[in-house]
């Protein structure tokens, strides 16, 4: 089974757990299948390729005659097919052509939720309609329409799902936006983020707060933490964040191999290690004689395709853009800012209408509408694709986006490894506020920052972050002023990072704090 995102794959894997004969079902992302093809074909350096480059090269391998084992299946299911466009759609078409003659396939999708065709641009490419046409016209598939609603638990939610009928009855985008706005007006209003934060913890089941942009998501995430509501950010589909217990256990291993008995002994003395931890790591690095090869495990995990159960998801209310919530469902959904987005004054596009419909169909039991009231003039820096908060003058910057991957480096030689790792294990939690303090020893062309948690160094930023910040504030810095300090970001998660090994300061595994938020600049 191929699903759209890693989050969706995790959900499907959880539901299959304990199901009879579930071992015969393999759930993967399309990016994961591409990686499998490249690995099997022995393509050099594929691990360092971007996800798009992997897709492109895997497509080339299939067209050149590759017959990968991953496609030796009895039936291939592709979910969320309306969001598979461009070269990913081409890869699916080639994969379907590689199936055995007696194998079947099922493509599942909802055309009303198609929000990625808009990314194809003027040059075009294969959209989901082209994918479906190839499946039916060239590969003998037949289309079947499913009209039932199998998700909604509440009559009002069912009304939201049935809004598709109103959208189908009108062609003009402004009228579609108006129709959705009328439907959303029937749902309870939660007021501001600060207002609904008071009663969200009382809701049973899973809760998601959906926004239109990542800048808004970062702001809402911070507001929830300020209100005392634990929250987590929904990550990009291609982001792989490993659970922290891997580093907590494996960093204690001395030598190149660890057997089951020694591993279980270390795991028993470590918090939050699941009972099946050994089995999960063995799937990532099979090894021999009931042992795990430490270097091989680190190398396999660096590939970015860990087995189910090794990715960190986090707890609390999920804060997500609508795009990142695709393929997921929640008991409760708060949609922030639809009145503004669907207002005729904003001249909503077809993509905005589709996004609104997607958001309305994520909830199963409750849908609440909230207002976007925070007075932040969020802007996106086109050169870096990052969000920032401008000042009164065009060149001013009050806040700047920090992403989870910006601290994807070891803490460095200014922090004793053992002390920093122990401090992360015992004193740092998601939601904690951190400061980014300039590290003048490493700040030359671009700034490097030490990550301080209550004054204690726990990490540092990488060159990508320094280059992005420099692109935004270079004019200010060129006047002779020092680089700014950044305050107000938070720990998004603790994660396991892996390296090539080679000593105490270059281990195979270490804990790393992922930091995110709209950090305030202090000059």
Model-predicted regions and their roles:
Residues 51-62, 231-268, 476-521:
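Charge-dense polyanion-binding interfaces
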Residues 382-523:
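Conserved active-site motif detector
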Residues 26-32, 51-58, 315-323:
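Conserved two-lobed SF2 helicase motor
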Residues 39-73, 85-95, 320:
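Conserved RecA-like ASCE ATPase "motif II neighborhood" in helicase/translocase motors
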Residues 192-318, 322:
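Conserved helicase/translocase motor-coupling segment
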Residues 4-14, 75, 81-195, 208-216, ...:
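Conserved helicase motor core of SF1/SF2 NTP-dependent helicases
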Residues 52-70, 144, 172-187, 257-287, ...:
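Extended, charge-rich low-complexity interaction segments
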Residues 1-45:
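P-loop NTPase Walker
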